[in-house]
């Protein structure tokens, strides 16, 4: 009986050897969208996906996750190319609305580590899409442009922990909110610096709403402390916003995370 079944066993093995590469090569883009949604708790979604996991496009949507009804879509479509390399994957992302040049990244898996390195880049994103993330963004309803620059940015996951190297700078330009009649309220800079203890710094570039703060990632958690205040002649116009974004302490609003 064993000898009689052997040819069938080889036939099945041969069929699988031919079919599995084809399945991987033509895996639909929906496979990628499902995994991204699961990994982010549903807060980052790719909808209306077309193509394959290797070359495809979709609509990028931010949501509040879970049962939240909040969602906001990035204008235009997000396009990607994923290519295998000898020690990992090469990723190219292009957003028609926001990336003058494609974003390039390299994923490497080695010695129990996963390493994601982002090539130095510049991009510009609409702040309005943040409202899709739910509280507090759905209340703030921010408007403006988010200008992102990265330099030597690299994340390494090992033994359940993440290490960060390089830096990123996010300039929030000409920002406004439905909670204030001021248009704009100001422009701001958020700087991320990697290292043994990654650090975050918030500063005001210009405007009547003054924001400052600093934070660090300690034990994989962000601890941030900052404050918001209004220029003396703009306190009434910014009162509602100051009440929402932090805990009032006189003319200031104290912001804490973690």
What are these regions (language model features)?
Residues 1-14, 33-39, 180-258:
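Extended terminal
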Residues 16-61:
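N-terminal amphipathic/hydrophobic interface segments
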Residues 44-139, 151:
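N-terminal beta-strand/beta-hairpin edge segment
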Residues 52, 72-74, 142, 184-186, ...:
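Residues that define the transmembrane beta-barrel architecture of outer-membrane proteins
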Residues 59-61, 81, 94, 147-149, ...:
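Residue-level recognition of well-ordered beta-strand positions that form the cores
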Residues 88-96, 113-121, 159, 163-168, ...:
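Short, well-ordered strand-loop elements centered on a beta-strand within folded domains, enriched
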Residues 100-102, 107-155, 194-201, 229-258:
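Extended amphipathic, helix-rich lipid-handling scaffolds
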Residues 156-198:
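Short helix-loop boundary/capping segments
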């Amino acid at each position: 009986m064993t000898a009689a079944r052997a040819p069938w066993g080889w036939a099945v093995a041969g069929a699988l050897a031919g079919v599995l590469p084809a399945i991987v090569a033509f895996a639909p883009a929906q496979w990628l969208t499902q995994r991204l949604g699961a990994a982010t708790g549903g807060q980052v979604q790719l909808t209306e996906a077309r193509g394959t996991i290797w070359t495809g496009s979709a609509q990028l949507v931010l949501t509040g996750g879970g049962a939240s009804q909040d969602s906001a879509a990035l204008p235009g479509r997000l396009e990607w190319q994923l290519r295998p390399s000898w020690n990992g994957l090469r990723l190219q992302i292009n957003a028609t609305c926001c990336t003058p040049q494609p974003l390039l990244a390299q994923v490497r898996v080695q010695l129990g580590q996963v390493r994601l390195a982002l090539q130095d880049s510049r991009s510009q994103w609409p702040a309005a899409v943040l409202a899709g993330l739910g509280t507090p963004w759905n209340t703030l309803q921010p408007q403006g442009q988010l200008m992102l620059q990265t330099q030597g940015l690299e994340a390494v996951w090992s033994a359940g922990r993440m290490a960060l190297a390089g830096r990123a700078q996010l300039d929030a330009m000409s920002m406004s909110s439905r909670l204030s009649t001021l248009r704009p309220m100001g422009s701001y800079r958020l700087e991320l610096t990697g290292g043994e203890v990654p650090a975050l710094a918030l500063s005001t570039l210009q405007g009547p709403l003054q924001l400052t703060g600093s934070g660090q990632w300690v034990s994989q958690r962000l601890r941030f402390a900052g404050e918001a205040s209004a220029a003396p002649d703009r306190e009434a116009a910014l009162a509602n916003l100051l009440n929402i974004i932090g805990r009032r302490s006189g003319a200031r609003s104290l912001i804490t995370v973690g």
